[in-house]
Amino acid sequence: MHPEAKEPDCGFSEVLPRELGSLFSDTYTEESHYAFCGTELRITQHYGANLGVAAPVWDAALFLCGYFEEQKLDFKGKKVIELGAGTGIVGILVSLLGGHVTLTDLPHALSQIQKNVSANVSSNNPPQVCALSWGLDQEKFPQDYDFVLGADIVYLHDTYPLLIQTLQYLCGPQTSIFLSSKMRQEHGTMHFFQDILPQYFASELVKRNKDEEINIYKVTRYQN
């Protein structure tokens, strides 16, 4: 445990090297509009910017946003971190709902996230945008989050131990984790949720889109 860890200083200029800006030259961008919880989100996706899976708005992210709307979850004043934020749509929505949000991803995705934050969130309560590599630098972050969020971040088997390690560090007894995932058999996603995750956390399937094969799990620490 590292109780001394505080919210990292994630000034955008500090976590994103200048040279990464060149990744976004001559790229194809697409702006999409989404409506959740009475607010409209304008999300730009930078295709062809070497972003890979971080570029698009995935269906699992939209499904999670819809779940928050349906359940009327109260994020006001809550401390929230999103892992593998990609476009940032989930964390941006939570920020607009009053959460104190930190959006994280690998360094190459941060410019896209920051642009979407700037397009949607006023200066009153902007999310922090930070680099976080699972299993490597999670100890730069605090351990008192109310919510940890992830949308379509369970798809590479080699990263599963790193994700578990990161969740174990970030989550305290009071933390609720929401993971929304496309259940891709070829990527072992079901294996993660049925066999790996229960070794470390209690999990509950709270929402399922049968047609799209997307599940939302609420995950918490086991209570002694």
UniProtKB/Swiss-Prot annotation:
<feature type="binding site">
    <location>
        <position position="58"/>
    </location>
    <ligand>
        <name>S-adenosyl-L-methionine</name>
    </ligand>
</feature>
<keyword id="KW-0206">Cytoskeleton</keyword>
<feature type="binding site">
    <location>
        <begin position="84"/>
        <end position="86"/>
    </location>
    <ligand>
        <name>S-adenosyl-L-methionine</name>
    </ligand>
</feature>
<keyword id="KW-0949">S-adenosyl-L-methionine</keyword>
<feature type="binding site">
    <location>
        <position position="151"/>
    </location>
    <ligand>
        <name>S-adenosyl-L-methionine</name>
    </ligand>
</feature>
<dbReference type="InterPro" id="IPR029063">
    <property type="entry name" value="SAM-dependent_MTases_sf"/>
</dbReference>
<dbReference type="GO" id="GO:0016279">
    <property type="term" value="F:protein-lysine N-methyltransferase activity"/>
</dbReference>
<dbReference type="Pfam" id="PF10294">
    <property type="entry name" value="Methyltransf_16"/>
</dbReference>
<feature type="binding site">
    <location>
        <position position="134"/>
    </location>
    <ligand>
        <name>S-adenosyl-L-methionine</name>
    </ligand>
</feature>
<comment type="function">
    <text>Protein-lysine methyltransferase that selectively mono-, di- and trimethylates 'Lys-165' of the translation elongation factors EEF1A1 and EEF1A2 in an aminoacyl-tRNA and GTP-dependent manner. EEF1A1 methylation by EEF1AKMT3 is dynamic as well as inducible by stress conditions, such as ER-stress, and plays a regulatory role on mRNA translation.</text>
</comment>
<keyword id="KW-0489">Methyltransferase</keyword>
<dbReference type="InterPro" id="IPR019410">
    <property type="entry name" value="Methyltransf_16"/>
</dbReference>
<protein>
    <recommendedName>
        <fullName>EEF1A lysine methyltransferase 3</fullName>
        <ecNumber>2.1.1.-</ecNumber>
    </recommendedName>
</protein>
<dbReference type="GO" id="GO:0018022">
    <property type="term" value="P:peptidyl-lysine methylation"/>
</dbReference>
<feature type="binding site">
    <location>
        <position position="105"/>
    </location>
    <ligand>
        <name>S-adenosyl-L-methionine</name>
    </ligand>
</feature>
<keyword id="KW-0808">Transferase</keyword>
<keyword id="KW-0963">Cytoplasm</keyword>
<dbReference type="GO" id="GO:0005813">
    <property type="term" value="C:centrosome"/>
</dbReference>
<dbReference type="GO" id="GO:0008168">
    <property type="term" value="F:methyltransferase activity"/>
</dbReference>
<dbReference type="GO" id="GO:0005737">
    <property type="term" value="C:cytoplasm"/>
</dbReference>
<comment type="similarity">
    <text>Belongs to the methyltransferase superfamily. METTL21 family.</text>
</comment>
